[in-house]
């Protein structure tokens, strides 16, 4: 393949080589518009055409566009020149799960987390008629938050690839992870073949080695055909039972994903995950509301009294600085940035803070206290232009009147506007007196404030 371009269509800077295969190389890239990190898969057209794999490339594109899930590597766009095809995909900073397993077996709770995310992704793909057919740790990537991402759909199949008997017939996958019915070159169900591979992955995560391994390939196939494997002594009984059902050589009696989710080991991990999330949410609430709740004094860990941080106040000059004139713009202005939203509230600061924490929890947003009256709100899932983050800051105009500004810090502006309009506005209705842009209420608000400020 010829030398890589340093810039791709003036949209992406192309950096270091991340990996390569027979027909493609993957490079680190960065968007010139958003500064977002991406991976750029460069495929040699001539090589692909020469061996008749053009349909496979088209299928991979179709599959990745269908399989949009938090635990599946996202395809951002596809471009082509005379000699190359470019996939711009999600960059997974953590690399392959294989590299982590190569260092030894994982702790059970860590293995459960990855297995849970793998099953979630595979179940979603199956619901969209997509079968991966090459599930292995080398094709499971980790993002910078240590979340698993299923990648490499080059050997995947769509439901319309089945023959009249309703089965798939192409032998695909890596030998050590392939189901017996695939090796036997008989028709097979894509769902059951993927479940077998997931079972092998689970074994590898917990054991640190393969369940079926032999220097002689035919002997390894024999072991796979008979499900001839032994679980190490440190495997929990619930794990052993689940693995025996996933690595059932009879695909007709092999466990389904629905039953995997009902298994005791899967549910036990889910229960622990729920408890951990609840603990984190409580911690977030404590961090967000303490010690700012009522504006009174609090105590530190030693029982000593201390003054809580105070909200930023707005004087007449601050209000004018926020404005485009001396009218109601003292609070909002007729022209405002699409990346900012403001509302006025007649509720005390403690009630506004409590409501922000409650709404963040309902909308599954992370919330962190940044300072006096300043909170960082963050979406868990990465959006089109990265993770959406916002600052919510409370300003005191008078003791009974506050201005709250919600400003986008990162992410997609359209996504921010949609969140504000469809989620935040309805959820915050109890504490809002007027939102920026609601003219009639703004005028009434201005009259009320002027009345309060007139000398007696």
From Swiss-Prot:
Sites bearing Phosphoserine, chain numbering: 156
Region Disordered, annotated ranges: 280-309
Domain Protein kinase intervals: 12-266
Domain notes: The activation loop within the kinase domain is the target of phosphorylation/activation by upstream protein kinases. The PPI motif mediates the interaction with the ABI (abscisic acid-insensitive) phosphatases.
Keyword NAD: no
SUPFAM superfamilies: Protein kinase-like (PK-like)
InterPro entries found in the cross-reference section: Kinase-like_dom_sf, NAF/FISL_domain, NAF_dom, Prot_kinase_dom, Protein_kinase_ATP_BS, Ser/Thr_kinase_AS
Gene3D superfamilies in alphabetical order: Kinase associated domain 1, KA1 (3.30.310.80), Transferase(Phosphotransferase) domain 1 (1.10.510.10)
Stretch list, region PPI: 338-367
Tagged with keyword Ribonucleoprotein: no
Active site: residue positions: 134 (proton acceptor)
Cofactor(s) this protein requires: Mn(2+)
Protein name per its UniProtKB record: CBL-interacting serine/threonine-protein kinase 2
Residues engaged in binding ATP: 18-26, 41
Annotated keywords: ATP-binding, Kinase, Manganese, Nucleotide-binding, Phosphoprotein, Serine/threonine-protein kinase, Transferase
The protein's Enzyme Commission number: 2.7.11.1
Subunit relationships: Interacts with CBL2, CBL3 and CBL5.
Pfam families assigned to the protein according to its UniProt record, in alphabetical order: NAF (PF03822), Pkinase (PF00069)
Any one GO MF annotation of this record: ATP binding
Residues annotated as domain NAF: 309-333
Source organism of the structure: Arabidopsis thaliana (Mouse-ear cress)
Record-stated family: Belongs to the protein kinase superfamily. CAMK Ser/Thr protein kinase family. SNF1 subfamily.
General function of this protein: CIPK serine-threonine protein kinases interact with CBL proteins. Binding of a CBL protein to the regulatory NAF domain of CIPK protein lead to the activation of the kinase in a calcium-dependent manner.
Catalytic activity reported: L-seryl-[protein] + ATP = O-phospho-L-seryl-[protein] + ADP + H(+); L-threonyl-[protein] + ATP = O-phospho-L-threonyl-[protein] + ADP + H(+)
Record region (Activation loop): 152-181
Phosphothreonine PTM sites in chain numbering: 170
């Amino acid at each position: 393949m010829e030398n890589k371009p340093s810039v791709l269509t003036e949209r992406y800077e192309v950096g270091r080589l991340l990996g390569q295969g027979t027909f493609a190389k993957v490079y680190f890239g960065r968007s010139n518009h958003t500064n977002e990190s991406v991976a750029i898969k460069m495929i040699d057209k001539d090589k692909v055409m020469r061996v008749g794999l053009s349909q496979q490339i088209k299928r991979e594109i179709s599959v990745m566009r269908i399989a949009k899930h938090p635990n599946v590597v996202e395809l951002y766009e596809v471009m082509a020149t005379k000699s190359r095809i470019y996939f711009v995909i999600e960059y997974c900073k953590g690399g392959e799960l294989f590299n982590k397993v190569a260092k030894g077996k994982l702790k059970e709770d860590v293995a459960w987390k990855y297995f849970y995310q793998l099953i979630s992704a595979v179940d979603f793909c199956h619901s969209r008629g997509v079968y991966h057919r090459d599930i292995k740790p080398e094709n499971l990537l980790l993002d910078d938050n240590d979340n698993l991402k299923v990648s490499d759909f080059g050997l995947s199949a769509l439901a319309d690839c089945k023959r009249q008997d309703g089965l798939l017939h192409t032998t695909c996958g890596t030998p050590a992870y392939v189901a017996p019915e695939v090796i036997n070159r008989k028709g097979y169900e894509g769902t059951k073949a993927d479940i077998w591979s997931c079972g092998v992955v689970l074994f590898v995560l917990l054991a640190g080695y393969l369940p079926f391994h032999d220097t002689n390939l035919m002997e390894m196939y024999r072991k796979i055909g008979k499900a001839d494997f032994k679980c190490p002594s440190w495997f929990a009984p619930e794990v052993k039972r689940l693995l025996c059902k996933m690595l059932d050589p009879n695909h007709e009696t092999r466990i389904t994903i629905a039953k995997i989710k009902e298994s005791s080991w899967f549910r036990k991990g889910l229960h622990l995950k729920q408890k951990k999330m609840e603990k984190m949410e409580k911690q977030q609430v404590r961090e967000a509301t303490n010690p700012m709740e009522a504006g009174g004094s609090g105590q530190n860990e030693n029982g000593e009294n201390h003054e809580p941080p105070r909200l930023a106040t707005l004087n007449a000059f601050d209000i004018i600085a926020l404005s485009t004139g001396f009218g109601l713009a003292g609070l909002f202005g007729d022209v405002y940035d699409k990346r900012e939203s403001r509302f006025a509230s007649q509720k005390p600061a403690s009630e506004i803070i409590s409501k922000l924490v409650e709404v963040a929890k309902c909308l599954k947003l992370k919330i962190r206290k940044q300072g006096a009256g300043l909170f960082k709100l963050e979406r868990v899932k990465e959006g089109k232009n990265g993770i959406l983050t916002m600052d919510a800051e409370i300003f005191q105009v008078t003791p009974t009147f506050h201005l709250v500004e919600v400003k986008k810090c990162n992410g997609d502006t359209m996504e921010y506007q949609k969140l504000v309009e469809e989620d935040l506005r309805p959820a915050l209705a109890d504490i809002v007196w007027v939102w920026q842009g609601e003219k009639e209420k703004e005028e009434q608000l201005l009259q009320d404030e002027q009345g309060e400020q007139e000398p007696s």
